[in-house]
Amino acid sequence: MSLRGQVQIARSVFLLRIYILIWVQCLILMSVCAFCWLVLPHRLEQLFSSVRLTLSCLMISIVCLGLLRWAEPNFPKNVWILLTYTLLTSVAVTASGFHFSHRSVIYAMVATVTLFCFLTLATYLFARDVELQRSLLTGASTLILLLFAVFSLFPEAVSEILVMIAGLAVIVTSVVCDTQDILHDIEYESYIPGALCLYMDLMYLFVSVLYFMPSEPGSAHTAQTTVAATAAASPQFVS
């Protein structure tokens, strides 16, 4: 077998291990969700509407970062560019989470992106010098402005669905491109950043699938109405 064939097999096995890791984490997450659904079904249903709003903010950041990535083809392959990509996503999700007062989602996302930052820095601590690109500053500014504009001018459900579809298309395209790069084009110096980029794309793809889970927006309102009615009726019952 030629050296090129051996490298192809090694990269295919590496990709397979990444997908196995993703599936194991997804199964663990689904098991936890199923357990919570059985133990606290009403509490979980009340959280669906807030989770959907936060994931919509995440999709907006993915759309902006995807456009920035296509504008600069080498965007995700460099360690510092990838680190900036991760930090931009963290800023976008954190800002949107504070906008809707979803503190638990903020903490979870910050913990995830912090892990990616430490992995990237630890792997390429002595990387070669990298030229800073103006497109990063432009993309960061555009991301902040777009987040503000969309949620100020278009709060309806229609814009939420459009953003979700666009974000899903960007994620699927990114997964396909990253897979092809790891199999064929990526250099060994950028192998781990490329794998981390693929891992992030798959994580966002799984999060976007959770977005399409059916929810009952009126469940929280119904529960609050029931609690208020019970509290109002309690003094009359006692008297």
From Swiss-Prot:
Q: Which domain of life is it from?
A: Viruses
Which sequence ranges form a coiled-coil region, renumbered to this chain? none
- InterPro entries assigned: Bax_inhibitor_1-related
Q: Where is the signal peptide?
A: none
Q: Provide the Gene Ontology terms for cellular component.
A: membrane
Q: Name one Pfam family in it.
A: Bax1-I
The membrane topology of this protein is: Multi-pass membrane protein
The record's subcellular location field reads:
Membrane
Keyword field: Membrane, Transmembrane, Transmembrane helix
Residues that span the membrane, as ranges: 20-40, 48-68, 80-100, 106-126, 143-163, 164-184, 192-212
Q: Which family does it belong to?
A: Belongs to the cytomegalovirus US12 family.
The protein, known as: Uncharacterized protein HWLF2
